[in-house]
Curated annotation (Swiss-Prot):
Expression tissues: Expressed in the inner segment of rod photoreceptors and outer plexiform layer of the retina (at protein level). Expressed in liver, but not detected in brain, muscle, kidney, retinal cone photoreceptors or retinal ganglion cells (at protein level). Highly expressed in the ganglion cell layer of the retina and in liver, and also detected at low levels in kidney and testis. Isoform 1: Expressed in the retina. Isoform 2: Expressed in liver.
Example GO BP: regulation of intracellular transport
Species: Mus musculus (Mouse)
The protein's name in its UniProt record: Receptor expression-enhancing protein 6
Subcellular location: Endoplasmic reticulum membrane; Cytoplasmic vesicle, Clathrin-coated vesicle membrane
Assembly, per entry: Interacts with STX3. Interacts with clathrin.
Top-level taxonomy: Eukaryota, Metazoa, Chordata, Craniata, Vertebrata
Gene behind this protein: Reep6
GO annotation, cellular component aspect: apical part of cell; clathrin-coated vesicle membrane; endoplasmic reticulum membrane; photoreceptor inner segment; rod spherule
Disruption of the gene: reported phenotype: Viable, however mice develop progressive deterioration in retinal response, and male mice are sterile. Progressive retinal rod dysfunction first evident from one month of age progressing to almost undetectable scotopic response at one year of age. Progressive degeneration of photopic response by retinal cone receptors first evident at one year of age. Defective retinal morphology with significant thinning of the outer nuclear layer and reduced rows of nuclei. Accumulation of vacuole-like structures at the apical inner segment of the retina.
The entry's keywords: Cytoplasmic vesicle, Endoplasmic reticulum, Membrane, Transmembrane, Transmembrane helix
InterPro entries documented for this protein: TB2_DP1_HVA22 (IPR004345)
Length: 201
């Protein structure tokens, strides 16, 4: 428990958007930012358990900050932060795929969105205990290295078949359009169209 508290306090000492906002609140209210952060986390947890739109809030938490950090990583000259956020997005995509197929079952568990949010926060935490890096190195990378040759071969075959299919469909559509245009094009006549005669009464 002390290790978790020390990590929490180290996080509060870092410079980022959240800690700057907590620092401003601390200056206004006189309440220490660790208590403010703990209160905000407790409210967030309660809302994820009982609030309306917990799914949306959980997805926003799992997407907004990582997207912001990814753009900053792209713009920075360092490659290390790029690797961290690419790894996060690989884990996020894999988690989304698993969740898509298991959502009908997991949706009924009352703590599902709180657990999902905790998992996503674990995956984006900075430092050596980053969940995305742990999952990548212990689960995803070994599976990828074991099966990537077969996956590359299957992807190559599928892309070749898709290109052949697209070329065949394009050829058939162009031929159908050419035949249709030949049928629709009227024969040219030298006589002008007859004028309409009105019957005066």
């Amino acid at each position: 428990m002390d290790g978790l508290r020390q990590r929490f306090e180290r996080f509060l000492e870092q410079k980022n958007v959240a800690t700057e906002a907590l620092g401003a609140l601390e200056a206004r209210t006189g309440v220490e930012k660790r208590y403010l952060a703990a209160g905000a986390l407790a409210l967030l947890g309660l809302y994820l358990l009982f609030g309306y739109g917990a799914s949306l809030l959980c997805n926003v938490i799992g997407f907004v900050y990582p997207a912001y950090a990814s753009v900053k990583a792209i713009e920075s000259p360092s490659k290390e932060d790029d690797t961290v956020w690419l790894t996060y997005w690989v884990v996020y995509a894999l988690f989304g795929l698993v969740e898509f197929f298991s959502d009908l079952l997991l949706f009924w568990f009352p703590f599902y969105y709180a657990g999902k949010c905790a998992f996503l926060l674990f995956c984006m935490t900075p430092g050596p205990w980053n969940g995305a890096l742990l999952l990548y190195h212990r689960v995803i990378r070994p599976l990828f290295l074991k099966h990537h040759m077969a996956l590359d071969s299957a992807a190559s075959q599928l892309s070749g078949r898709a290109l052949d299919l697209a070329a065949g469909i394009t050829r058939d559509v162009l031929q159908a359009l050419a035949r249709g245009r030949a049928l629709v094009t009227p024969a040219s006549t030298s006589e002008p169209p007859a004028a309409l005669e009105l019957d005066p009464k």
